[in-house]
Structures are given as structure tokens and as C-alpha cells.
């Protein structure tokens, strides 16, 4: 059921464009119902009549009231997207995949960013629902360890789907990369380049992506019989200053750290800047691997080895799955939930070549 506020109903029914179908009908001396059918491309109206009506509509500057039309159809042909930060290349590439796929399917996209704040994320969900989007694509904030707002969205029947960062909610689909394998590959790469004491910058372990990247890090250590040292695992919000603080902590340890795997490129770059300021040579003294392949990672000196994520493809797949859920009956949605896991790839650059 779609609930419509009184304000929306008044707007949809009475705040029309300057020209209406009645103006077109009056000018052509035909019924308004015929004009309506023609504007909706009904086969009941001849092409000749359609052409006359379209010409007059253009002449009068007529524009359809999409809100009224959508209210009648009980859909808006709009999906909402919430990302932590639009400025991150990974999320902007996901958005590109979403927008292109949605556009091809006749949908508009509303893009929002939580700025890693749970309070803001809650408000954005409320706003999107108030705007009656047909569905939502969401990558949760670092603060999202409680998700009553998402359960509310599920319970009111609005289709939504996670990408990249997700919460474990039953019957909700996700499109992810193999974060465990990415963490494993990054760490093993450092080990194969001679590193033994490898620091790891991670995010909140309540979020599956950081938990899985950390698990991959630990598995690589285990495979190569390198003991895990808890002081080498540094958790933060993974901003650039967090990377610098993490680097400072690693340099204060009583033994030499010779490698760093950061769960994102931003913190890795912060660490690199700090190491260079302290006279630490990269990769000779410390080799570094990031995660996400931000464009800047290829331009800094030395260039940053990183894990690449197929952001555009994630956006495409997530949108296609969401549109499938939107088009199916509510009773069928619970049976459609699926987790799609895509592969990541290691891009070797100068920060880890010894």
C-alpha cells in the first residue's frame, strides 16, 4: 500500500503545468480523453492524430505532471543510493555503474552520502522513504553497528540491497567483493617479498568487510607460519591522519616492522607520508600495500601497491538485482535474496617491490 500525504495529493491533483490536456483538447476541438491516450501512446489513437496532438502540446509548452502520474501508478521510477563518501573513487565508480544501469531501465537515481555517520544514515533512509523511492542501494557507514532503521525499511516492504559494506539481515541481498581473499593476497604478497613483521590497519570489526580483510591477513600469516602479534593490528576510521598515527605506533614498537597492509588506500597514503617524514625508506625499510585502488595511489611516489575492486561492475549488478526485486511481487522477494561475491585483484607497484 502507498501512503500519500495531503500536501502531495493537492500538489499532484491541482498544481498542474500552465498548459493542460484540456487546453490541448480545446485548441484542437477534440476530447481530453483522446489527448490523454495520444500522450500515453495508446494504439487506440491514429498516428495522424497523435502527431497533431504532440505538435499542439509542444506549441503550448505542455509538460506531463510526473508526480500525479506516479501517484496513480503507485511507483516513482526512482531508486535511492546511500554511500559513505562520494569523494572516494571506489564509490563514485559504483555510482557510475548504478546510474547507467538505472537509466537504461527508465529509472532516476537519488544519490546521498552518510559521511560515515549513523545518525545521518538514518535520516537519509527516512528521507528516501518519504520521497517514495521504489528501492534503495546502500553501503553502510562505519558507525552502523545497529540497524533498526534498515529493519524498518525491510518491514515496510521497500526493496533494498547492500553493496560493499553490508549488515547481516535475513532475506536482503548483497553484492560484495571477496574481502577475505583480498586481505590474504595483500598480506601474502608482502610475505613473499620478505616481510615478517607486518602491521595491519583495519576498520571497525563490527563491519564484515574489515573483519574479513583482517581474517585474510591472519590466514596468510598462518599459512606462512608467522605468529600473529596483536600490537600489529591497529583499528581506526582509516582516514589519512589515522594512517599517520598508525605508522607512528608501528615505529614505536621495540622491533622492526617491515611491512604494512592497510584496509584502504587513504590510511596507507597517510602512513607513507609519515614514514617518509621520519626518513623511513619505502619499500626498502617498510613495504606497503593498500586496498581499493584510488587514482592517487598510482600517482604518489612511490606508487602504491593495492587491491583493485570492480566498482562499476558492482554498481551494475547491484542495480539489476534491485530492479528484479522491485518488479517481483512482495511475496516472492524473500526467496530472491542472494549474495554475489566478485573477485578483486592485486596491482603491484613500487611501494612493495624490493
Briefly describe each language-model feature range.
Residues 1-16, 20, 74-188, 192, ...:
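Alpha-helical recognition/docking segments in bacterial nutrient-uptake
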Residues 1-77, 353:
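N-terminal helix-turn-helix DNA-binding module of bacterial transcription factors
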Residues 27, 32-37, 72-87, 189, ...:
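Short beta-strand segments enriched in small/hydrophobic residues
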Residues 84-93, 111-120, 140, 165, ...:
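Hinge/beta->alpha junction and helix N-cap segments in small-molecule ligand-binding domains
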Amino acid at each position: 500500500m502507498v501512503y500519500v500525504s495531503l500536501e502531495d495529493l493537492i500538489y499532484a491533483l491541482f498544481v498542474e503545468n500552465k498548459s493542460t490536456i484540456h487546453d490541448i483538447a480545446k485548441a484542437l476541438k477534440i476530447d481530453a480523453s483522446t489527448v490523454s491516450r495520444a500522450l500515453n501512446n495508446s494504439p487506440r489513437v491514429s498516428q495522424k492524430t497523435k502527431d497533431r496532438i504532440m505538435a499542439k502540446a509542444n506549441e503550448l509548452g505542455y509538460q506531463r505532471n510526473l508526480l500525479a502520474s506516479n501517484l496513480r501508478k503507485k511507483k516513482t521510477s526512482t531508486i535511492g543510493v546511500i554511500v559513505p563518501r562520494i569523494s572516494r573513487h571506489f564509490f563514485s565508480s559504483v555510482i557510475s555503474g548504478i546510474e547507467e544501469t538505472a537509466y537504461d531501465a527508465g529509472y532516476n537515481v537519488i544519490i546521498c552520502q552518510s559521511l560515515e555517520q549513523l545518525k545521518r544514515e538514518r535520516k537519509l533512509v527516512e528521507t528516501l522513504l518519504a520521497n517514495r523511492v521504489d528501492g534503495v542501494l546502500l553501503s553502510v557507514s562505519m558507525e552502523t553497528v545497529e540497524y533498526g532503521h534498515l529493519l524498518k525499511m525491510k518491514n515496510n516492504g521497500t526493496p533494498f540491497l547492500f553493496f560493499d559494506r553490508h549488515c547481516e539481515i535475513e532475506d536482503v541481498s548483497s553484492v560484495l567483493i571477496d574481502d577475505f581473499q583480498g586481505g590474504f593476497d595483500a598480506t601474502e604478497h608482502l610475505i613473499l617479498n620478505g616481510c615478517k613483521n607486518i602491521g595491519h590497519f583495519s576498520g571497525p570489526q563490527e563491519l564484515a568487510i574489515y573483519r574479513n580483510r583482517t581474517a585474510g591477513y591472519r590466514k596468510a600469516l598462518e599459512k606462512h607460519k608467522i605468529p600473529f602479534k596483536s600490537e600489529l593490528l591497529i583499528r581506526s576510521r582509516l582516514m589519512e591522519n589515522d594512517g599517520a598515527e598508525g605508522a607512528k605506533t608501528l615505529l614505536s614498537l621495540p622491533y622492526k616492522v617491515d611491512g604494512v597492509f592497510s584496509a584502504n588506500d587513504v590510511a596507507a597514503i597517510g602512513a607513507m607520508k609519515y614514514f617518509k617524514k621520519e626518513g623511513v625508506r619505502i619499500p626498502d625499510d617498510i613495504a606497503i600495500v593498500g586496498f581499493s585502488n584510488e587514482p592517487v595511489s598510482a600517482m604518489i611516489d612511490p606508487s602504491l601497491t593495492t587491491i583493485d575492486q570492480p566498482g562499476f561492475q558492482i554498481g551494475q549488478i547491484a542495480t539489476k538485482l534491485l530492479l528484479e526485486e522491485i518488479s517481483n511481487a512482495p511475496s516472492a522477494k524473500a526467496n530472491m535474496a542472494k549474495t554475489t561475491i566478485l573477485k578483486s585483484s592485486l596491482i603491484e607497484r613500487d611501494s612493495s617491490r624490493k
